[in-house]
A protein has these predicted regions:
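Residue-level recognition of single "structural anchor" positions
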Residues: 1-232
């Protein structure tokens, strides 16, 4: 599941603008229904980056010179032109996936995201990023750091979260670029698909309709123009 706005419009028989507005009103509801989530036990955590995008923004309102779609960011390494999405996955399949900040994350941003959403005394498996050290200490988590170049430390690894990132990037690629202000909705859409991936298509369709109507989105068309990237 996951078609472009144009393909969705053609299938349903509506214009592209209506397809766009319907998609994000529905995804606003799905995001509200899912919430941030909760992880517990053995947890793999990492971050994934997407190039900042102003797709759909008029040239006159652009905060920087536009870049051709798919073109590489000029700055090397992690920069403020990248959106950092924090992810955490436990062995039961529970998932947290939220846009966190622009550029490099800090332990305070991690704490802001995971406070109240991560089980006490859990085992946290991460790469060697320093921000996780202070975060794990403050939250009283047993921290297993997987050193660069290694795949695991005993039974602890981050292979599941790395695989999730690979699938996420492949899935995002089908949309031909997503504006950063909507990336939160796409992360929650991906999360929904993952949580219900073993269900039959008929059950998925029923769940999607029901769950998108459990909550109400007060989003108006004019609000889309004013929306900014939503960070935790």
């Amino acid at each position: 599941m996951g078609l472009s706005i144009r393909k969705s419009a053609k299938i349903v028989g509506i214009n592209i603008a209506t397809s766009f507005f319907w998609r994000h009103k529905i995804l606003d509801c799905i995001s509200s229904f899912l919430g941030t989530g909760h992880v517990d036990g053995v947890i793999e955590a990492d971050e994934v980056f997407f190039a900042e995008s102003f797709k759909g923004t008029r040239t006159a309102n652009m905060p920087r010179k536009s870049r051709k779609r798919g073109k590489e960011i000029k700055k090397r390494g992690i920069s403020k032109e990248q959106i950092c999405v924090a992810t955490a996955l436990d062995r039961q399949g529970n998932l947290i996936i939220e846009p966190l900040c622009k550029g490099r994350m800090t332990h305070k941003e991690l704490e802001s995201l995971y406070k109240g959403h991560i089980g006490e005394n859990s085992i946290l498996c991460t790469d060697s990023h320093k921000s996780y050290i202070k975060f794990a200490t403050d939250f009283n988590l047993d921290h297993k750091r997987i050193k660069t170049g290694k795949h695991k430390e005993g039974i602890y690894h981050i292979q599941h979260i790395n695989s999730l990132h690979s699938n996420l990037k492949k899935w995002m690629g089908r949309f031909n670029g997503v504006a950063s202000k909507y990336i939160s909705n796409y992360m929650h859409w991906f999360k929904w698909l993952r949580l219900f991936e073993t269900d039959r298509d008929s059950v998925k369709t029923k769940n999607f309709i029901v769950q998108s109507n459990v909550t109400y989105a007060y989003t108006k068309i004019k609000d889309f123009k004013l929306r900014t990237p939503q960070f935790v």
